[in-house]
Amino acid sequence: MIQVQTILNSADNTGAKKLMCIRVLGGSNRRYASLGDIIVCSVKEATPDAVVKKGEVVKAVVVRTKKEVRRPDGTYIKFDENAAVIIKDDKSPRGTRIFGPVARELREKDFMKIISLAPEVL
């Protein structure tokens, strides 16, 4: 459950470390984003040689949330951190590597490139 002002970790190698959600996409009054949802973020922390710079506004997809998400079979999944992957306008990741596990919900939302780069899909 990600809302405006939420700080997320970056789960890719674009050089961004911390992202802050500034908009949840999908309707004018949408408050929360969950796994597989696209958000607009501001880069709050980045490495010096980063692809993205501090202060840059980027689109990202949520890949891990602390809030548990119910699956259709009745099981729940939650992670230790909130994390997102920075994406281009065509839903492909801007980085070339993904760090940490990602949720299976991304497969249903057509983020196949992120699924294929991820070391583990839970």
Swiss-Prot record:
GO terms for molecular function: large ribosomal subunit rRNA binding; structural constituent of ribosome. Pfam families: Ribosomal_L14 (PF00238). Keywords: Ribonucleoprotein, Ribosomal protein, RNA-binding, rRNA-binding. One of its GO terms (cellular component) is cytosolic large ribosomal subunit. PROSITE patterns: RIBOSOMAL_L14. It comes from the Bacteria. Signal peptide: none annotated. GO terms for biological process: translation. Coiled coil: none annotated. Part of the 50S ribosomal subunit. Forms a cluster with proteins L3 and L19. In the 70S ribosome, L14 and L19 interact and together make contacts with the 16S rRNA in bridges B5 and B8. Binds to 23S rRNA. Forms part of two intersubunit bridges in the 70S ribosome. HAMAP family: Ribosomal_uL14 (MF_01367). Belongs to the universal ribosomal protein uL14 family. This is Large ribosomal subunit protein uL14. It comes from Carboxydothermus hydrogenoformans (strain ATCC BAA-161 / DSM 6008 / Z-2901).
